[in-house]
């Protein structure tokens, strides 16, 4: 961080202790205290009040990239994540939060904007059934505590970049590489592991994070991207190439703020996803790959789809 940016952040922290902006007269969190630092940071993830539901939405485009050919715009997407946080307190570890959520992302026809039921694969010529993202749950694996097992401070709130009172957060990547539930037991030898990289950038008012009376940072905008292999329902059968997701979105105030195409589809076909799981939800997380595996297994068990041949 440059010295000018450091001074800017320190100046904003000092200014936040004074009556200014929409937080006139509001108490300010002391982020040198790990409990209060956690309160400031958790506002972006969900809300600090138990039972308060948070809703994030995004929209964007999915492109293909295959060596030797022009990138194609395959789909538009509309997505949302609905979540809440459980709040915990411990004599040694201090304050803690754990988020629980469900998420939906729809694949749309890039020409008409309509939700796709089937898709004509331009490389194989096959018409395939579209499986939209409907992951339930997408939870934090453990409680995020303000202190470690020995009571030492763990949580911090130190934004890297603040410009004109706005925190810009991003620049890193989630580099995902783990066993693919659709592959076999020999992935360490033959390959086939799930391999992707995800990027998330967020911007929000520093004042909202430091306002002790605010339970959440409502004015947050996001940009999410992913580079990955083909989606399993596309039936690409190992063809060379990758997919690039590029989206932008924001935190919404209410369910009614979702675009109609997304809201209507969830209400009609994914009503469970209108609310987050309970805070004590201990189910394993789902991904597109685990959901698709279950769909394939169910269809094969019912005879709707044939078993894969031995050759």
What are these regions (language model features)?
Residues 1-10:
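Bacterial N-terminal signal peptides that target proteins for export
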Residues 2, 19-22:
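C-terminal cell-surface anchoring/sorting signal
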Residues 10-20:
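Bacterial N-terminal signal peptides
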Residues 19, 42, 113, 125, ...:
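Short, flexible coil/linker elements and helix-boundary hinge sites characteristic
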Residues 26-107, 245-256, 260-264, 272-311:
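N-terminal segment immediately downstream of the Sec signal-peptide cleavage site
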Residues 68-209:
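Predominantly extracellular/secreted and cell-surface proteins with exposed
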Residues 167-311:
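A eukaryote-biased signal for long
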């Amino acid at each position: 961080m440059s010295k000018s940016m450091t001074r800017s952040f320190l100046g904003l922290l000092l200014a936040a202790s004074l009556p200014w902006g929409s937080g006139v007269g509001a108490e300010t969190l002391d982020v040198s205290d790990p409990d209060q630092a956690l309160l400031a940071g958790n506002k972006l993830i969900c809300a600090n009040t138990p039972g308060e539901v948070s809703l994030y939405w995004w929209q964007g485009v999915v492109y293909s990239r295959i060596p030797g050919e022009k990138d194609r715009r395959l789909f538009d997407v509309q997505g949302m994540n609905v979540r809440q946080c459980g709040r915990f307190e411990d004599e040694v570890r201090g304050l803690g939060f754990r988020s629980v959520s469900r998420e939906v992302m729809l694949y749309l026809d890039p020409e008409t904007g309509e939700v796709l039921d089937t898709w004509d694969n331009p490389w194989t010529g096959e018409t395939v059934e579209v499986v939209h993202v409907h992951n339930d749950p997408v939870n934090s694996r453990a409680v995020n505590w303000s202190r470690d097992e020995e009571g030492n401070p763990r949580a911090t709130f130190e934004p890297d970049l603040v410009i004109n009172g706005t925190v810009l957060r991003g620049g890193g990547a989630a580099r995902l590489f783990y066993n693919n539930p659709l592959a076999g037991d020999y992935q360490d030898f033959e390959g086939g592991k799930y391999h992707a990289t995800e990027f998330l950038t967020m911007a929000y008012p520093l004042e909202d994070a430091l306002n002790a009376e605010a339970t959440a940072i409502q004015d947050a905008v996001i940009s999410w991207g992913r580079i990955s292999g083909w989606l399993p329902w596309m039936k690409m059968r190992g063809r060379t190439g990758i997919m690039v997701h590029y989206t932008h979105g924001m935190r919404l105030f209410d369910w009614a703020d979702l675009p109609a195409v997304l809201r209507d589809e969830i209400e009609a076909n994914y009503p469970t996803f209108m609310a987050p799981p309970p805070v004590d939800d201990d189910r394993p997380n789902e991904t597109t790959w685990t959901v698709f595996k279950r769909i394939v297994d169910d269809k094969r068990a019912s005879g709707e789809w044939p078993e894969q041949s031995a050759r």
